[in-house]
Amino acid sequence: MMKFSVIVPTYNSEKYITELLNSLAKQDFPKTEFEVVVVDDCSTDQTLQIVEKYRNKLNLKVSQLETNSGGPGKPRNVALKQAEGEFVLFVDSDDYINKETLKDAAAFIDEHHSDVLLIKMKGVNGRGVPQSMFKETAPEVTLLNSRIIYTLSPTKIYRTALLKDNDIYFPEELKSAEDQLFTMKAYLNANRISVLSDKAYYYATKREGEHMSSAYVSPEDFYEVMRLIAVEILNADLEEAHKDQILAEFLNRHFSFSRTNGFSLKVKLEEQPQWINALGDFIQAVPERVDALVMSKLRPLLHYARAKDIDNYRTVEESYRQGQYYRFDIVDGKLNIQFNEGEPYFEGIDIAKPKVKMTAFKFDNHKIVTELTLNEFMIGEGHYDVRLKLHSRNKKHTMYVPLSVNANKQYRFNIMLEDIKAYLPKEKIWDVFLEVQIGTEVFEVRVGNQRNKYAYTAETSALIHLNNDFYRLTPYFTKDFNNISLYFTAITLTDSISMKLKGKNKIILTGLDRGYVFEEGMASVVLKDDMIMGMLSQTSENEVEILLSKDIKKRDFKNIVKLNTAHMTYSLK
């Protein structure tokens, strides 16, 4: 028996299928060990003619449906029934695979006896792909000890006998999310599920005019698939507690990432009864005991979806978005919420950390100014206080910066270097946090991972003079989590900055090892017996110009003892 059957459903794929076929022809794996099964859904272009050109390069099976099925399910089923490989790999016609995919997968499967193998995906042309389950290669994972439930597309490798023996095929009557039902069935029936993440093996490509994805799918059709998945989980040959946990995790996924997320705030009011009825049919298939296992903020949504109560369902989603509730209190760090008069209290709802976006970050040798916004926070403005926290990497020292400006939930903090420079030498690295306080509860969030474009090149720094010593302050983004931190270290001025006279009344400061930013404005140079005023301007990231109010002689230039900017003095002698 050959090792693999690569299954490719096609429909009007002439513009991009060559890339896939080339990737299959270039496989670093014996051509006798895999077949390519192409089933065409009545293309009206040159798709099949292009495929036929690969007869001598690939072990091809090609067929065409008599009538267009309107979705990839039927072509995949026809191909699966034809498959002779020990394993099948489903590949969409607009995607392609790494030349080592089949070779590495075969070796991994032989070693670990996998029934389902997830291979690491990479998005191309802005295509989003699941990533969280591909952090590392794992010979065996489950639906509960991994993130595989968050990838239910069929683009994986399956043991053919697993699918055929358990009658796992794509439901052809369903035109939306049918692949999720297929993949969940495979997960539930597999003896071993594995993840191969050594490299990118599957390239998912964003194309224009994709086949089935843009067609309208009614709420009834969509939620019927979700209901069938719930039923499939509940009917699995597993312990009840285990099934309930899997179903709860599926609900977490569904309400977080599917079209259900925020639907009552997006769908037209006149269409919402149709949606809640279909969603309610799905949720009514979920036993109420499972509600206790889902993310706590979903429990009110499950309650009102099961009751098909669109008005209160909408109130919950709107309340979460605004962070405003009919009644609420916080007990032991959790929310107790009543969403409407006469409605039940929902207790013990976790307060998720807010997401913080750094919308601005500017600095010079005088101050650091950063602006932050809070996103997706369950508590509305007016119920919490914010402050910036600088915490030393060794966690021995902490500095707090109060809020300077609140402009429509845009929080600005001014870190005055004159106020904190005496504390900075105590530690080289200072991490930046936003603290959000609600009563006695404090939430701490690192800053910088989400941000607008950073205005400086890497290593751009500020020059600070403290107790006759010079230091540089360098903001940077951490390697692992891409958050902003401040690096503070002593330097030798002559190794870092050059100072030259240009003409008779301009002084040019140039960074030698990196760019240095200075506060623009009034400045002065102090000689042994004179002081000359000037205007400092940043002409580039590593060059500063001081335009003096009068000429200075070269011999006097060599005797400058101090340089004063608006808020910093640099002793040069």
Curated annotation (Swiss-Prot):
Attaches beta-O-GlcNAc (beta-O-N-acetyl-D-glucosamine) residues to the C4 position of poly(RboP)-wall teichoic acids (WTAs). Mediates beta-lactam resistance in methicillin resistant Staphylococcus aureus (MRSA) strains. Belongs to the glycosyltransferase 2 family. It comes from Staphylococcus aureus (strain Mu50 / ATCC 700699). Pfam families: Glycos_transf_2 (PF00535), TarS_C1 (PF18674), TarS_C2 (PF22377), TarS_linker (PF22181). Its EC number is 2.4.1.355. This is Poly(ribitol-phosphate) beta-N-acetylglucosaminyltransferase TarS. One of its GO terms (molecular function) is hexosyltransferase activity. Mn(2+) binds at residue 94. Signal peptide: none annotated.
